[in-house]
């Protein structure tokens, strides 16, 4: 009887571990219903030989970060409006918010992360759905707030490539210098 009970418990534990491993790999893409109506924030100078400075403060939502393509589509709407208004040329410097790139850690995550009511809840979903990456990042984390560092390190390698492709691609597409926050 004892062997049977141990066998059942081991089988249940193995099944739970298998289901958790399967669950962590599932990344369903939700519907994308972001507001693409835009309003430019700061426009200093006149487009011309000396160039101009254009500040863009996009209104972003968690689901805008589901994929780099969604974020790109949102930012393109702002830059297209600026181009239509004649505000962009080769000497234009477009400035985006300070931490616009930091949120790339949320790309490719489960729907629960985007529905989180608070940052801590989103961080918990990130750790739960990327257990091996997060554990490795926690071991190499540095600084006073090792947990916060680990959340970023867990996806840092992916974020670097996404950041370069996204913001570099926008700068090239619109022929401007783009200053995007970390």
Regions found by a protein language model. Name each.
Residues 1-182:
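Hydrophobic structural segments
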């Amino acid at each position: 009887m004892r062997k049977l009970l141990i066998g059942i418990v081991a089988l249940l534990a193995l099944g739970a571990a298998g289901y958790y491993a399967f669950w962590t790999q599932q990344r369903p893409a939700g519907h994308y219903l972001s507001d693409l109506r835009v309003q430019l924030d700061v426009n200093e100078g006149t487009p011309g030989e000396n160039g101009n400075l254009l500040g863009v403060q996009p209104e972003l939502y968690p689901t805008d970060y589901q994929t780099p393509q969604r974020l790109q589509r949102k930012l393109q709407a702002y830059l297209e409006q600026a181009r239509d208004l004649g505000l962009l040329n080769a000497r234009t410097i477009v400035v985006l918010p300070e931490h616009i790139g930091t949120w790339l850690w949320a790309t490719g995550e489960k729907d629960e992360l985007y529905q989180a009511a608070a940052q801590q809840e989103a961080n918990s979903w990130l750790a739960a759905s990327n257990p091996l990456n997060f554990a490795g990042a926690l071991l190499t984390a540095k600084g006073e707030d090792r947990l916060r560092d680990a959340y970023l390190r867990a996806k840092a390698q992916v974020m670097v490539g996404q950041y370069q492709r996204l913001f570099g691609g926008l700068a090239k597409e619109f022929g401007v210098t783009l200053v995007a926050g970390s």
